[in-house]
Amino acid sequence: MQITIREPGSAITHFIGMMMAIIAATPLMVKAAVGSGAISCFALAIFIGSMVALYGASAIYHSVTVRDGILKIFRKLDHMMIFVLIAGSYTPVCLVILDAKSGYTLLAVVWGIAIIGMITKACWITCPKWFSSAIYISMGWVCLSVFGSLWNTLSRGAFLWLLAGGIIYTVGGVIYALKLPIFNSKHKNFGSHEIFHLFVMGGSICHFIFMYLYVA
């Protein structure tokens, strides 16, 4: 039986991302369980879960060949999980790094935006790419509201890993929004969207390193 993957480049990249997240969960959670408290373990579990959800939903959406109505549902889930990943990445920072007042306030804001964003995607999946990217990027940089606290609390190494992840995600979001021909290779299965996928994975790797070294 021949198996057909609808968009091989996009499906494979984020299937790899999902597997990397699953594999990375063990050392991260073991380290947190040994050296950190229950709140850290909970927050890091949310972070890992958000990565698995995003990469899993994306891999499935880009893999399946089904009728349009079902494919549209998978597409909505794919886009909705981006909000989950962003909020999930914020969660350990809010609960472990920041003080209670700033942390819980920021946590409520980002998860509030995530819920609104998911509802928007569920109702308006055809919104322009620039609009989606603007929301994703803006949500990602809400942390500027606590820049001073992060700068004063984190070591320079920790701050740089956190910042690097944000920058890489942002570059990927711009590539996704603009879909410039320069990013499209002669291979039809690997173009600007697949490059966007690689940038998302790069951002996740930076943030995983940050979580493992400085949060767990």
Predicted segments, located by residue:
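Multi-pass alpha-helical transmembrane bundles in non-GPCR membrane proteins
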Residues: 1-216
